UniProtKB/Swiss-Prot annotation:
Species of provenance: Thermococcus kodakarensis (strain ATCC BAA-918 / JCM 12380 / KOD1)
EC id: 2.7.7.3
Gene Ontology biological process terms in this record: coenzyme A biosynthetic process
Protein name: Phosphopantetheine adenylyltransferase
Lineage, opening ranks: Archaea, Methanobacteriati, Methanobacteriota, Thermococci, Thermococcales
HAMAP family per record: PPAT_arch (MF_00647)
Function: Reversibly transfers an adenylyl group from ATP to 4'-phosphopantetheine, yielding dephospho-CoA (dPCoA) and pyrophosphate.
Annotated family: Belongs to the eukaryotic CoaD family.
GO cellular component: cytoplasm
Localization: Cytoplasm
Reaction catalyzed: (R)-4'-phosphopantetheine + ATP + H(+) = 3'-dephospho-CoA + diphosphate
Keyword line: ATP-binding, Coenzyme A biosynthesis, Cytoplasm, Nucleotide-binding, Nucleotidyltransferase, Transferase
Effect of disrupting the coding gene: Disruption of the gene results in CoA auxotrophy.
Pathway: Cofactor biosynthesis; coenzyme A biosynthesis
Length: 165
C-alpha cells in the first residue's frame, strides 16, 4: 500500500502504553513510509501529573519497541527528546506530524517554529481522542492515578458493567 507521506513524526511520553497511544502510533505507520518517534526524556516528565509514577525512559522505550515489533512495523526511528518540540522544528525532510485532537495545538507550535527557521510547515494528521468506558479520555495520568487500566476500563468499578451507565 502506498503511504501518503515519506517521513512523519509523532511524539510523546508513551507512559503505560494505552489505546490512545496505540491509535496514534498506528495512524503514523499508516500514513508514513518512515516514522520518527520522539520519546520524552526522564527530565522532561518531571512536571507531569503523578510524575513519580512515570516509568523510566528505558522501560517506556522497551514497551514502545515491543508494540512496534508485535505489529510488524518497520522503517522507524525512536529519538529521545528533551523539549516539547524535540527535533520536529529542525528536520527539513519531515512532511507530516501525527497528533490527537488534544495535542493539535502542539502541532501548530511546531509549525510556527519550523516557519521561523525557514522550513516548510508540516501537514497535521489528527486522530480523535479515545474515550474510556466512563466517557473520559484514556490518559496515562488516569492510569497512574489507578483509576483506569490501559484499555480504559475502570479499576474500581461498583456495578455490573461500565456500559450499563
Amino acid at each position: 500500500m502506498r503511504k501518503k507521506y515519506r517521513k512523519v513524526v509523532v511524539g510523546g511520553t508513551f507512559d503505560r502504553l494505552h489505546l490512545g497511544h496505540k491509535a496514534l502510533l498506528r495512524k503514523a505507520f499508516e500514513v508514513g513510509k518512515i516514522v520518527y518517534i520522539g520519546l520524552t526524556s526522564d527530565e522532561m516528565v518531571r512536571n507531569k501529573p503523578y510524575a513519580e509514577r512515570i516509568l523510566p525512559y528505558e522501560h517506556r522505550l522497551k514497551d514502545l519497541l515491543k508494540f512496534i515489533e508485535v505489529n510488524g512495523y518497520t522503517n522507524y526511528r525512536i529519538i529521545k527528546i528533551h523539549t516539547a518540540i524535540g527535533f520536529a522544528d529542525s528536520m527539513k525532510s519531515l512532511e507530516a506530524i501525527v497528533v490527537s485532537e488534544e495535542t493539535y495545538k502542539g502541532a501548530l507550535i511546531v509549525n510556527r517554529a519550523r516557519e521561523e527557521k525557514g522550513l516548510k510547515p508540516l501537514d497535521i494528521v489528527t486522530i480523535p481522542i479515545i474515550k474510556s468506558y466512563l466517557g473520559d479520555k484514556i490518559s496515562s495520568s488516569l492510569i497512574r492515578a489507578g483509576l483506569i487500566d490501559p484499555f480504559g476500563r475502570p479499576l474500581h468499578w461498583k456495578g455490573n458493567s461500565p456500559k450499563d451507565v
